[in-house]
Design a protein with these regions (language model features):
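Noncatalytic, solvent-exposed loop/strand surfaces
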Residues: 1-221
Length: 221
């Protein structure tokens, strides 16, 4: 069993009308009631071959009643209906599964019925894929410029654009997200370009906070 995990919990607001916490780790997804920690649902089977080194870094992400679970070192995505899992449906709560897409380190972003996955594998580094959360189909992909830098930061959605930061601190802005085929609209380079920038950018009062290896930047228009 893979037991090492570097993840954050995901808080979802509507599991049987109650706030709940979803955690992915040790080859399982668990849903616990936020008020008292009571277990509401549990799903295993993410590591059927008992691989020893499938640590969890990328966190699950929720949108509505669907929670998306990246696993298998970036090789798989599993979408789960939270309500069905809380009803004890087990594997029948799985809406869809893909083994051709994933994210090992960056946590996907989600909203409006879609998930945005930043792939960080050797052959797919810098590929952004928009996935329909209901049926699991890819709606579009964008390849960021290839470089030696990988991707550890999680993407940020602000308005109709997405911000994706490389390990060298360079941030790409992609959009508009509701376009048939979004494009890179901006490339922002910082002076501290030493690897590794791993912190995710966050919005702050009409600006963007970016933590590189040595510096903290506040970026405004």
């Amino acid at each position: 069993m893979a037991s090492v995990a570097w993840i954050e919990s995901v808080v979802t607001s509507d599991v049987k009308g109650e706030e709940a916490i979803a955690v992915m780790g040790a080859d399982h997804l668990t849903i616990n009631r936020a008020s008292d920690g009571k277990l509401l649902g549990k799903l295993g089977g993410f590591n059927p071959n008992q691989e020893q080194y499938w640590r969890s870094i990328s966190s699950p992400v929720a949108d509505g009643n669907i929670i998306l679970c990246p696993y298998a070192r970036g090789d798989t995505l599993t979408a789960v209906d939270i309500d069905l899992l809380a009803e004890g449906k087990g594997k029948d709560a799985i809406l869809w599964f893909r083994d051709d897409l994933g994210s090992d380190v960056p946590t996907p972003a989600a909203g409006g019925g879609r998930a945005y996955v930043v792939s960080d594998g050797k052959s797919s580094k810098g590929v952004i894929t928009c996935v329909n959360l209901v049926n699991g189909k890819s709606e579009w992909t964008v390849q960021l410029p290839k470089s030696r830098g990988g991707y550890s930061s999680s993407p940020l959605i602000a308005g109709n654009h997405m911000y994706v930061t490389q390990e060298n601190g360079t941030t790409f802005v992609l959009g508009p997200l509701n376009a048939v085929q979004p494009a890179i609209v901006s490339k922002n380079v910082v002076s501290d370009d030493e690897p590794f920038t791993v912190a995710s950018p966050i919005p702050y009062q009409e600006s963007l906070l970016l933590r590189s290896r040595h510096k903290l930047y506040r970026i405004v228009e």
